[in-house]
């Protein structure tokens, strides 16, 4: 999966974060997902002093009522926190959890 994402710099469940990560966790909990989403953040150098962060989140398919495709979503940001916020937002917009 790490193809050209860069160097892994962090894996987190973003439990202390504010903004979209706790909203995504709440949305998934209400949709009968049993675990908080886990975010992986990769860093890729773009030039002198320039780093592109790519956060990914994997949301497994749900086994309650109907089958849903698993989602592997990624987003870019200029900081680790921004990339996590962006990927959580994209996951909320893309998932049909509730």
Where are the regions that the model predicts?
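N-terminal segment of the canonical double-stranded RNA-binding domain
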Residues: 1-70, 77-85, 89-98
């Amino acid at each position: 999966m790490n193809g050209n994402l860069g160097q892994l710099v962090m894996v987190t469940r973003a439990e202390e974060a504010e903004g979209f990560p706790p909203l995504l966790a709440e949305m998934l909990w209400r949709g009968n997902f049993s675990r908080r989403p886990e975010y992986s953040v990769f860093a890729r150098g773009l030039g002198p002093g320039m780093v592109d962060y790519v956060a990914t989140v994997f949301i497994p398919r749900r086994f309650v009522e109907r089958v849903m495709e698993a989602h592997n979503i990624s987003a870019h940001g200029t900081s680790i926190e921004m990339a996590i916020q962006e990927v959580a937002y994209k996951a909320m917009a893309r998932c049909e959890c509730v």
